């Protein structure tokens, strides 16, 4: 049943929207913009995996023509615990972003519920500073008062399926970009 639910949910993703997101990411990489990724729990693993597949995979597949600048805000346990302890867990992503973000950068958030205060604060900060936001959400409705350039809601309440789809869409995007630079699209 898990697998069938996974297949059903992944088929509900709007392919045109996913392609638009992938093209935005590709453009940001070509312009040498930074792309920040963030998530909590299992979604933080997706954010960190995103960093790996793009920074290494895309760079090598493009034979160094593309050099992605992916920064995971979920990656440094030292920063996360210092900010949590000294300021607030709700600021673990925003405070890091303030240190690095530049005009033209982009943020990608992975959130099962879409209600995590640290993710919402990050998106609000990005909105205030005109930074493009892409939000992948598992279930529930989009929080009020936040704006995203692109938004995908999987509408599935199983955390495992949601996080598997987050991971799968990340692979689809990275491999699509990689295939553009690989002979005969060998990756796909």
What residue ranges belong to the model's regions?
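A short, well-structured juxtamembrane/interface segment
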Residues: 13-31
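Short glycine/serine/threonine-rich phosphate/pyrophosphate-binding segments
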Residues: 43-48, 115-122
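A charged, well-structured terminal subsegment
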Residues: 99-100, 161-188
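Short, glycine/polar-rich helix-capping loops at beta-to-alpha or helix-loop-helix junctions
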Residues: 135-148
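Glycine-centered short loops/turns at secondary-structure junctions
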Residues: 32, 104, 130-131
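Short beta->alpha connector loops at strand-helix junctions that form conserved
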Residues: 111, 137, 152-160
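Generic N-terminal amphipathic, Lys/Arg-enriched alpha-helix
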Residues: 1-13
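Glycine-rich, small/polar surface segments that engage phosphate groups of diverse ligands
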Residues: 27-100
